[in-house]
Design a protein with these regions (language model features):
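Beta-propeller blade signature
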Residues: 364-369, 433-442, 487-500, 540-551, ...
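Multi-bladed beta-propeller domains
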Residues: 375-400, 440-454, 498-512, 547-570, ...
């Protein structure tokens, strides 16, 4: 490609009067942006306009000067050698406060510590601890202060243990100050320790003595720490030799420290690229860096330079870095497909961003040619295109709004979504919804593939020839939606269709939203799923995968965080990295759009519910909603729609102001170069416009497509479990599982949140108990499965009560044979079974129906008759708890339900933040500690309570109710009829 390694435009240094540093920087940025904005529309292909945009971006990077900790590439210098513990520890007391870490022990170190030697025993006044705040600060919330009077002490005395309250650093001016002024503590060695496993890192530590409380005794004193890791670094004596990651923030525009950091990053980038490209291509550029470095020495020796000189040297360093970056052989394409699109209006929410009526008109489908040259050219691919087929035949796609472009593996065909964006808010009609279109890569043959009152978007070419996409066709509504603003919020999930738009089938029967399907290197379909069956609304919207025909949906990462703040809140736009087992995604917010910070995901390490499988690619931007809370989300929606080129290199869109995003090349070492920006509208979804290897086409194993039905006889769907005891949790001692209970989760069919209130837990699902199937003595099960229904399983003990329950769900398709190893089996351990499972030696079991009142679920039919037979009369006579079945005031429930459910029943709450709700929260079920086994009501169902003896069927009904979240309603409509005990079937199942 001719543009690779081409020198970017070298502007003439501007001559202007000298002004103050801050004012000059602001003036330079404003002038450059004004130059770009004043250019005529056709001039955006000219070198001057692109130069102005690139320079404006460089100035913005200098203004922000975010140099976060990141993996340091091995450089061809002595600096790449092993770092000693005392060398890294020196950064904890060097006086530099950057908001980032000053030292960093090994990741996940057991009981890590850092210490400083004051040189002599000193009566302490206070210790001031500045936390790093470019990563979750809560990791040090249990920090301890320990002391010793002599170096080499065999033991340390703990003189302070923090209470768990999160503290911060210099950026927030909220360090932890430990007061020893009246404690009588004397120490020579001051050690900070975090008990347990921790990736221990702090910004800075200061120690003050009682003799002179104004003097920081720890400053530049010898320090040490327990271990070093990949983020540890040698503290250099001068700024020239310091790695970029240790440079403090600039206090003036275009500081020499920042220029040297750019030079150092250029060297490291050249060293990386030298392994995959001809070194002679990089030699002149490295020589340029050396020459610049010498001139910087001269400036430093002369005591500095005026801002215009520093700016010129900074631009020179950036040009060299940009040239080195464009020598990257992974940038071996000369066209980039992308769309232009305004951020949607209305509610900032992950769901509402993809409703067509909220789209802002403008944008289109574009191609950026020669993106790595001085004069990239932008072409509107649909400028003269007219729809040839579909409702909009004969019309151009304007104004409207575009979304989610997709390129075929051979590079010849493009799919995208488009909405006219007309109508009211909200409105679901052909004119208001997104529909999928197809066009050739040269802009010809524009046809409409989908239409109707459904949102259809996020198309994805499947290797077998079909197209996966996201659609609202299944029906149902968001369970926590319809309140702010009061819009209906339809659910959208995975579908597929033939290449011509025919033969549309449902791939996912999930009851809440899914997004952004793509095909990974193994031919599997990956996508983001919001999964909150009986769980907090805000903890699980991460990557899932399934076969291209929808079979076997699995969460292989991130679905069960220990706490919400410990990892990305949400992961959007997932894509497989070429030649790798890793994936890239955007760490985004629940209460935001699909932008944020970029992460790489590796499923091979075991998931610790936090960051074990996650690497930050852009740590300059915190993880939205995880870090900074809800108020900071809009300002953190900076990066988005990453397209991986390798584990190191990516295309994406970015804007530091989270407003007008341009197309960038970035790498995971902090380099970022602007390729294109439109001053009027954001860019989205850059894709190299070229062929790429097709993943394997996995065979269909269901009979739902027209082609499959024609070739394969219809067969019942089945589910097999090899060994229910094979799990990554501890079963209660002596438990014997005899059956599986199968429960259907019903999609919400009424738009407003908690209308109706299904039960004591907020925002929970209506459900139906389909029945039970036997489990063999070896823990295996094999049974017929209902097609097209979202179901989950409970493992029942010998007495018929649930021991364990899923807090997720699955489904099967026509003809599918779903197999599970166990009950939440360990993903990183192979099964140990030697003999065939007993259940597979027989025919599949039919589902044994549940008692009346369980399907559909109905408290008045399932539970109230038991109370009427055994409890109501006695309670009424003794003026005890009212267990009458008459109507109560709240939610249309009966008196008995209102008095029993919340206090004596058991339920999981589903509201935002309920992960922290104790027994009603959490992310996973603790075996033997939920449902009937954990309810207070269980203590009143035997002879201990006034000699009560319930027949097995009646006690089973009560246990079933308790195991099923102690719900009241089983459908979302006709609540008065349900309260009267009438059978009300769900409208959508």
């Amino acid at each position: 490609m001719q543009a690779l390694c081409k020198r970017p435009p070298h502007p003439r240094p501007p001559g202007r009067p000298r002004v103050s540093s801050a004012r000059a920087s602001a003036f330079a940025l404003a002038a450059i942006w004004a130059f770009a904005a004043d250019a005529s529309p056709g001039a955006e292909t000219a070198a001057g306009s692109m130069t102005a945009l690139v320079q404006a971006d460089w100035i913005e990077q200098d203004r922000r000067l975010v140099l976060p900790p990141r993996p340091i590439e091995p450089a061809p210098t002595a600096a790449a050698g092993t770092v000693a513990t005392h060398e890294d520890a020196a950064g904890g007391c060097d006086g530099r406060k950057t908001g980032r870490f000053g030292f960093h022990t090994a990741s996940g170190e057991q009981d890590p510590w850092w210490q400083v030697d004051l040189g002599r025993p000193v009566p302490l006044d206070r210790v001031v601890i500045y936390n790093r705040t470019d990563a979750p600060p809560e990791r040090t919330a249990r920090i301890q202060v320990q002391v010793a009077r002599e170096p080499g002490a065999a033991s340390f005395k703990t003189v302070y243990e923090h209470n768990g309250k999160v503290f911060y650093g210099s950026r927030e001016s909220q360090p932890l100050t430990v007061d020893f002024s009246k404690a009588g503590v004397t120490a020579r060695i001051v050690r900070l320790r975090v008990p347990g496993r921790c990736s221990f890192a702090l910004e800075e530590v200061e120690v003050y003595g009682r003799d002179d409380p104004r003097v920081n005794l720890a400053l530049d004193r010898p320090a040490d720490q327990k271990s070093v890791g990949p983020y540890s670094r040698r503290r250099a004596a001068t700024a020239k030799t310091a790695p970029a990651e240790s440079v403090p923030p600039a206090h003036e525009p275009f500081s020499l420290a920042h220029i040297r950091a750019v030079v150092e990053r250029g060297r490291r980038l050249a060293h990386r690229l030298g392994k995959i490209t001809a070194p002679q291509r990089l030699a002149p550029l490295l020589a340029g860096l050396d020459d610049l470095d010498e001139r910087l020495d001269g400036i430093e020796a002369a005591g500095g330079a005026a801002e215009p000189v520093r700016r010129d040297r900074y631009f020179e360093a950036r040009r060299l870095l940009r040239q080195i970056a464009f020598c990257n052989p992974r940038l071996d394409f000369d066209r980039i497909l992308f769309i232009k699109r305004h951020d949607p209006g209305g509610l900032y929410h992950m769901v509402h961003q993809y409703y067509g009526f909220g789209a802002v008109a403008g944008g289109g489908l574009f191609v950026l040619s020669d993106p790595f040259s001085d004069e990239p050219e932008v072409t509107n691919l649909l400028e003269t295109a007219v729809v040839e087929q579909g409702r909009l035949a004969g019309r151009r796609l304007e104004p409207g709004s575009f979304l989610s472009p997709e390129l075929s593996f051979d590079g010849r065909t493009i799919l995208f979504a488009y909405t006219q964006g007309e109508g009211e808010r909200p409105e679901w009609s052909p004119r208001a919804c997104y529909h999928i279109f197809r066009v050739a890569a040269d802009g010809t043959g524009l046809v409409q593939l989908t239409d109707g009152p459904w949102e259809d978007f996020d198309p994805c070419f499947l290797p077998g020839g079909r197209i996966a996409f996201i659609s609202t066709r299944r029906g149902g509504y968001l369970r926590c939606g319809g309140s702010a603003p009061p819009w209906d919020s339809p659910t959208y999930t995975l579908y597929s269709m033939a290449g011509d738009g025919s033969d549309v089938i449902c791939l996912s029967y999930h009851e809440t939203q899914e997004w952004h399907p793509s095909v990974d290197n193994n031919g599997m379909l990956i996508y983001t799923r919001w999964d909150y069956v009986d769980r907090d609304t805000n903890i699980a919207h991460h990557i899932w995968n399934c076969y291209p025909d929808g079979r076997d949906p699995r969460s292989f990462h991130g679905n069960y965080p220990v706490k919400r703040e410990s990892r990305p809140w949400m992961e959007m736009s997932p894509r497989a990295i070429p030649g790798s087992n890793k994936y890239v995604a955007t760490a985004a917010a629940h209460h935001g759009h699909a932008f944020g910070s970029l992460v790489a995901i590796d499923y091979r390490p075991e998931d610790d519910g936090a960051m074990a499988q996650v690497e930050r690619l852009t740590p300059d931007v915190p993880l939205p909603e995880s870090e900074g809370g809800k108020a900071a989300i809009r300002g953190l929606m900076a990066y988005g729609t990453p397209w991986p080129l390798s584990e190191d290199d990516y295309l994406c869109v970015y804007d530091g102001r989270a407003a007008n995003r341009g197309i960038y090349w970035i790498d995971r070492f902090g380099n970022r170069e602007l390729l294109y920006r439109d001053r009027e509208i954001s860019c989205l979804s850059p894709i190299p416009l070229r062929p790429r290897p097709a993943p394997p086409a996995l065979p269909e194993r269901t009979t739902q497509t027209a082609a499959a039905r024609a070739e394969t006889p219809a067969a019942a769907a089945t589910i097999a479990v090899m060994n229910v005891y094979d799990g990554d949790f501890q079963w209660p001692e002596g438990v014997k599982i005899t059956a599986l209970r199968i429960i259907q989760v019903l999609p919400k069919t009424t738009p407003p949140v908690d209308l109706p209130r299904i039960g004591a837990g907020t925002e929970t699902n209506a459900r139906a108990v389909l029945g039970t199937v036997p489990v063999e003595a070896d823990g295996s099960a094999f049974f017929e499965a209902p097609v097209g229904k979202l179901i989950y399983f409970q493992a029942l003990g010998e007495e018929g009560m649930a021991v364990q329950s899923m807090r997720s769900a699955t489904y099967v398709h026509p003809g599918e044979r779903l197999t599970c190893q166990g009950c939440h089996e360990p993903k990183h351990r192979p099964p140990s079974r030697q003999e065939p499972p007993l259940a597979l030696l027989r025919e599949p079991s039919p589902i044994r129906p549940a008692p009346d009142g369980a399907n559909p679920f109905s408290y008045p039919r399932l539970v109230q008759p038991v109370l009427d037979r055994h409890c109501v009369e006695c309670h009424r006579a003794k003026n005890a708890l009212d267990l009458d079945g008459s109507l109560a005031a709240a939610h249309g429930w009966t008196r008995s339900y209102q008095n029993l459910a919340a206090k004596y029943g058991f339920y999981f709450s589903v509201s935002n933040g309920s992960i922290n709700a104790g027994a009603h929260g959490g992310g996973r079920t603790t075996a033997g500690r939920f449902g009937a086994r954990a309810s207070k009501l269980l203590n009143y169902l035997d002879r201990r309570h006034y000699g009560v003896e319930l027949p097995a069927e009646d006690s089973g009904r009560i246990a079933l109710w308790l195991d099923c979240n102690s719900e009241f309603y089983g459908s979302y409509h006709d609540t008065e009829r349900q309260t009267r005990g009438e059978v009300v079937l769900p409208r959508l199942d």
